[in-house]
Amino acid sequence: MNFTRQDEILKLIVEDFIASGEPVGSNSLINNHNLQYSSATVRNDMMKLESTGFIEKTHTSSGRVPSSKGYRYYVEYLKNMKNLSVDEEFKREFQIILQKKSQSIEDIMNESCEILSELTNSATVVLGPDAASENLVSISMISISSTASTAIFVTDKGYVEHKTIYVKNENQLKKVNECVAFLNKRLIGTKVSQLVGKLEALKPILSDVLGNSSNIVMDSFIEACVKFAQSRSMYHGATKLLNNSEYQNKEKLQAALDLIQSPEKLRESIKSGKVEGFSQNEEEDVAVLSHDMEINGFSRGKIAIVGPQRMDYRTIIGALKYVAEELSKYYDIESEAEEEKDD
């Protein structure tokens, strides 16, 4: 990204407005940042930025504020920066989370969201992997007792779901395993979103072959597949939006809360963004910053920050990048350690 004088002025306008909430004028830019440009030059550049839609005039002040387009430009600029600073206390807290060896990736992402919410004073959301579009690659059974067995479902993107099946006796468990073997041959390669329909179609065939035992398997599998295809999400810090000065308008506040509580809406919002990992709804004054969390080459979902358009993008983007990079590094090291043990 070639950085011109207008780019510098736009960046400063966005940062000053984020910090103060007050419209920004040419004189305040020059005085606050010791700019070596004349007032006329800065005013002229601001007029050009306004005419191209990057900043806009408010009704109550002669200063200017960033438009949605201006925020997008600023976010793209930050995303291209290689060494954004990250709050040291946040880094320490995140490393403490990583040191809890017994935790799952999902637990780590959830705890990361809690401290991100505190750092950014915004709502944070963990979105689980979108498994519905993935293909099933295996179903395996692990016996846990003489009357119980756990079915493990795995997709081509490495996402895993499980369901424990309980029966009355060993003979019935044997029948259950036969059912699973039958289904394994017919379900592998099926999209997760199509599994329930395929299971329903196979019900009569399986019942003819294996009798009543098939009902136990089918009901358990259908429950697991419905759960598999659902969007999983956990959110933190929703109450922080209640105290945000940008959300005095109750309708705008409700729009932000609705987005946090609806994983499908949030996914759609993220997909609709003109800048990768950033989306906005100008009318409702809602912005979403998100980052993919990849572990060993597979997506484990996204962490998203939801708030008004006026939020601390520099801090948020730096923290999201840090979490993604540290998670990936941590699990790469864990994988290498496991491989060395196997050798």
Regions found by a protein language model. Name each.
Residues 12, 16, 52, 73-81, ...:
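Conserved, well-folded catalytic cores of nucleic-acid-processing
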Residues 1-11:
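Short alpha-helical segments that sit at the start of domains
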Residues 10-26:
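Short helix->loop/beta-hairpin flanking segments within DNA-binding domains
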Residues 19, 26-78:
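N-terminal helix-turn-helix
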Residues 82-343:
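Intrinsically disordered, acidic Ser/Thr/Pro-rich low-complexity regulatory segments
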